[in-house]
């Protein structure tokens, strides 16, 4: 699925470039990374001082080293706009780090040494930031709190507008009806059988004719004794062939049928109103569950719970 993951707040792939603007332009990322860095520095400096005066728990050194790489990883993921790609791993590392920092707080907070108490304060800050990050990165992009937080970021897209949906028919499934354009003839091909009113190809004759006799007078039928030039019969045959092709294209057998299997399920992350000029599109509401048959293009063949089928833009859906 072409997820357009940027709209989820950090969905670039592993090849995304490092850009500090993704941190500076996101108040949430900037604040949490700054607090985590400050907490780590407080804990690190205080641990060095506490280790000079008296014995310091070795376990807390491991917690400091571990959280250093966790903060570095979160910073790189946000700066590279790759949060959506690595959010599962980030939550796992943060959960383990939360255990380490809270254990360090328990081993330092009850000492009378001011340095150890300061180190415990730094670990408390790290624990608080870890809880916030787990709640943020561990939630779906459609969660209300994530959408509220992401709305303040400069680089994170929001609900796509109808003006951005300039998708061509080449990306659509085979659900649109097509018809062959009628072939046009010039005067030399008609050889004197031109008519002042256009021929529509309907059995009733030309458009605007009041009676069938009036429209048929310009074109004598074979049984009426008319003399035809040599090139009339090929024209008549070709016209009949075109009419037959047009009937074949509009017959029920030639029309596209929706698929019978919908192996995928998708959730609407935004509400969508179908284009009134396109009968193939369907409307749906935010958080509505749709069944999808094909996810290879920008427009997906979808089926609603009420049985309504049609095409839906992929950038409004997320696979479940």
UniProtKB/Swiss-Prot annotation:
GO terms for biological process: regulation of actin filament polymerization. InterPro entries: SH3-like_dom_sf, SH3_domain, Sho1_SH3. Glycans are attached at residue 58. Residues 166-182 have a biased composition (Polar residues). It is a multi-pass membrane protein. It is found in: Cell membrane. Pfam families: SH3_1 (PF00018). Keywords: Cell membrane, Glycoprotein, Membrane, SH3 domain, Stress response, Transmembrane, Transmembrane helix. Residues 51-59, 103-117 are extracellular. Belongs to the SHO1 family. Forms homooligomers. This is High osmolarity signaling protein SHO1B. It comes from Hortaea werneckii. The lineage of its organism: Eukaryota, Fungi, Dikarya, Ascomycota, Pezizomycotina.
